[in-house]
């Protein structure tokens, strides 16, 4: 069991039960999955770019990414239907907790002039989205080996019914929200 999962079981569940007055332990919101998505627009011209993005994402998450493809053809973006335009990874259970722990305690503090993540990026359904501008904040990525600085989107999907519950869940888990 990972460090974050133990913290969730021993500290977060009792704290949330007290704060929101849950009667049953199953009502307490929990992390369901984390989706890490990397949109690689340049992949339409050069397939090598997508391969290096996949390699980066695999190193960061420890899981093989799936290639995302264009749903429709868009002439303005010069893409056709089913062209590869990015990659994503869905993390659940142990891998999810390991990644969340690494993100909150190691990667985010390495961001330049980091003052905390926005507390407004909730979607109204208890999910939290976070954008990262460069992949080099993760310790697995070697600075000399990257071909291009790429960003990524990280979505925390929770079982929380409201944004307030999700915010408290992530705050107790150690997400550094800006004040």
Swiss-Prot record:
InterPro entries: Ribosomal_uL5, Ribosomal_uL5_bac-type, Ribosomal_uL5_C, Ribosomal_uL5_CS, Ribosomal_uL5_dom_sf, Ribosomal_uL5_N
Taxonomy, superkingdom: Bacteria
GO cellular component terms given for this protein: ribonucleoprotein complex; ribosome
Record has Membrane as a keyword: no
Gene Ontology molecular function terms on file: rRNA binding; structural constituent of ribosome; tRNA binding
Keywords for the protein's UniProt record, in alphabetical order: Ribonucleoprotein, Ribosomal protein, RNA-binding, rRNA-binding, tRNA-binding
GO process terms (BP): translation
Keyword check for Ribosomal protein: yes
Disulfide bonds: none
Functional summary from the UniProt entry: This is one of the proteins that bind and probably mediate the attachment of the 5S RNA into the large ribosomal subunit, where it forms part of the central protuberance. In the 70S ribosome it contacts protein S13 of the 30S subunit (bridge B1b), connecting the 2 subunits; this bridge is implicated in subunit movement. Contacts the P site tRNA; the 5S rRNA and some of its associated proteins might help stabilize positioning of ribosome-bound tRNAs.
Subunit (UniProt): Part of the 50S ribosomal subunit; part of the 5S rRNA/L5/L18/L25 subcomplex. Contacts the 5S rRNA and the P site tRNA. Forms a bridge to the 30S subunit in the 70S ribosome.
PANTHER family the UniProt entry points to: 60S RIBOSOMAL PROTEIN L11-RELATED
Family the entry assigns: Belongs to the universal ribosomal protein uL5 family.
Protein known as: Large ribosomal subunit protein uL5
Protein species of origin: Clostridium novyi (strain NT)
